[in-house]
């Protein structure tokens, strides 16, 4: 089933990452690099099986392609999934191992914080690769992206209200 899913997904590259000693099981999905390197966060959560994690990674990476293009960014779309419960299975070793996989892609994929991960996790990824955004400001990063995400969501709501009701206030 996994290969059938990959054959019809239209993705450029999918990487399965495994390091049992580090507790790492992950999937990196690169949907498109037409506009530039694939950019998208890494989320950590439990899945019923690998197929469910793959399906999520493919769906989310495709969405990132469109989201980044609509935002006018010179980046493509990608997404990564760390399979595991962030409350009980999150380790420095897993994120550093993931960082080595990201680094092996040579800049084709740039990762960032997403559901189940935080700035400290991105710091562990950063210890292994430069292809990560959202690290602490002392390392030249933007830090926690939550305020920017909230602002973007607010702007989207305001634009929707303006479109519906014609009032810019």
Task: Name these PLM-found stretches.
Residues 1-143:
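N-terminal ligand-binding/catalytic initiation module
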Residues 132-169:
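Hydrophobic, well-ordered beta-alpha structural blocks that scaffold small-molecule cofactor pockets
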